[in-house]
Structures are given as C-alpha cells and as structure tokens.
C-alpha cells in the first residue's frame, strides 16, 4: 500500500509500504525512497482493547538507533495516564496525567523521572525538554473554575467566570471572563451571540477582537478597532475556500493551500495527502 504524488514532470513516493494488523489497523509505515534516507514508524496496540500503547521511529541515516520510542499507559477507565518519549542520547520527555471521579483532567505534568508518582509532583522536580505542570479545578457540575500553570521558575493561576446556573440561565457553560494572578497577572472578558459563538475576545498585543459569524455559524471575519484582521469565504458545502489575513491571501482547493503575499507577490503552496 503506497502513496505517490507528482508535481510537474517529477513524481515521488511518500509512503513506500504500509503494514496492517489482522484487525485492519495500521502497524507500520515506511516513508521515502531515497537510498539511505527512508524512515519507518511502527505503532503498537493492546491486543484486547486495540488502544495505542506505543510508537517507534527509525531512520536509515541512524542505523541501529531508535530516534523516538514512545510508550502510552492508561488507567482502568481508558484515560491516558502517561506518554513517555525516549529520544537519542537517553533524553526523556515524560508527560503524566491525573483525573477526578468525573474522569476530568485535573493534573498534567512532566516529572524529572521516568515514572508518574503524584506523591513526588513538585514545581522544583519538573523535567524534560519543555517542563510544565498544569492543574485544573472543577465544580460539582463539571465546570472548570481555575487553572494553575507552572514552569520551574514561574507560576500563575487563572479563575474562570460563568453566567449563573439553572434553567433560566443563558449559555451557562460559556466563559465570560478570566482573572489571572501570579507571575503573569491580567484579566480578560468574552461575549457570545445567541448561538453560543464568541463575538468578542482579547486580541494579541492588547485591545479586543470582534468575531463575525454567518447564518451557518461559520466565522467570516475578525476585526480589531474597526479594521479587518482576517476574512474567510466558504463554498455552498461549508468548506473554507479563501482566507485573507494581513498581506496574505490563501486559497484552499483540492487538498492544496495556495498562499499569495500581496506585498511581495510571492506565491507559496502546501499540499496535503490522506493515506
């Protein structure tokens, strides 16, 4: 099972070979045909549940070396509790996850060990290439009430505001505001239309953005201080066909993105394949 593409007079095979398990799930894929530069990704699954339990990446340019060895662990309810990636040289990116009785994520962190012991979870004991520790608090009906973000050197807590609960409440699960304390303090507010679409939100760099939606609840424009930040156009099926943002206009057609820089007249493109 291969995937081949062409551009002009040249063609290339992107997926050289695909191997499947007896259940029809993909077990391995071989990429590329250039001598000595192909790579293979292998996926491991639990035979009873078919849950993904691991992934290995091997490249021909590094024979005998596993470029990435990822393992995935679950709790009895099927929630992911650990994703551990071991990289060349022994560097480990270990992400751990804990859940409450409602099976909502409450803790996500990267310890400086290969295990996920909640008893050793500490801001000073974070590790990996991008160390972090995030905690979420929820109320009895499942709304997130606060989030605490930590790195080895910083910490901040964000609390969330909602409309009132009850049958007469409008959009009771829509976040209307946030208040952040700690190393990155700040406040933010949000509004929504009757369909629940966000109509106002904080803008990057300060100020607010207004979001405009059509009758099909598709985002058509983002504005700031009366000026357009981005515009989107859709076809009759609801698929986005055009996006204008800044000096770039992007056309989406037949699995391709064709972008024109209206200032420099430079055209770039991305092509996407399904396999």
Model-derived features: where do they sit?
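Surface-exposed intrinsically disordered loops and tails
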Residues: 8-12, 112-130, 166-168, 183-187
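Surface-exposed extracellular loop regions of Gram-negative outer-membrane beta-barrel proteins
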Residues: 1-3, 98-121, 191-233
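Short, small/polar residue-rich loop motifs at catalytic or cofactor-binding pockets
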Residues: 12-14, 36-40, 66-68, 90-93, ...
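Short glycine/acidic-enriched loop and turn motifs that connect beta-strands
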Residues: 34, 60, 87-90, 152-153
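Short secondary-structure transition motifs
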Residues: 131-178, 206, 211-275
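Beta-strand-dense domains in secreted/periplasmic systems and polymorphic toxin scaffolds
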Residues: 1-6, 26-29, 52-55, 80-83, ...
């Amino acid at each position: 099972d291969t995937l081949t593409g062409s551009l002009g007079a040249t063609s290339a095979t992107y997926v050289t070979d695909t191997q499947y398990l007896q259940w029809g799930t993909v077990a391995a894929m071989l990429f590329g045909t250039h001598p000595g530069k192909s790579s293979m990704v292998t996926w491991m699954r639990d035979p009873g549940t078919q849950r993904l339990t691991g992934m290995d990446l091997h490249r021909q340019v590094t024979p005998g070396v596993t470029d990435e060895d990822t393992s995935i662990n679950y709790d009895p309810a099927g929630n992911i509790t650990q994703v551990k990636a071991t990289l060349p040289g022994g560097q480990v990116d270990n992400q751990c996850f804990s859940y409450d009785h409602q099976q909502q994520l409450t803790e996500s962190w990267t310890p400086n060990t290969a295990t996920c012991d909640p008893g050793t979870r500490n801001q000073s004991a974070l590790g990996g290439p991008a160390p972090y520790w995030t905690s979420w608090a929820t109320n009895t009906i499942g709304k997130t009430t606060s989030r605490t973000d930590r790195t080895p050197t910083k910490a901040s807590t964000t609390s969330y505001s909602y409309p009132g609960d009850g049958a007469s409440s409008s959009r009771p699960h829509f976040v209307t505001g946030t208040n952040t304390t700690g190393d990155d303090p700040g406040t933010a507010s949000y509004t929504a239309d009757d369909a629940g679409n966000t109509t106002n939100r904080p803008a990057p760099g300060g100020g607010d953005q207004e979001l405009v939606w059509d009758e099909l609840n598709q985002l058509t424009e983002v504005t700031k201080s009366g000026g357009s930040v981005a515009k989107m156009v859709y076809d009759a099926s609801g698929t986005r066909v055009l996006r204008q943002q800044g000096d770039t206009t992007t056309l989406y057609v037949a699995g391709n993105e064709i972008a024109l820089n209206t200032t420099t007249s430079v055209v770039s493109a991305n092509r996407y394949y399904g396999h």
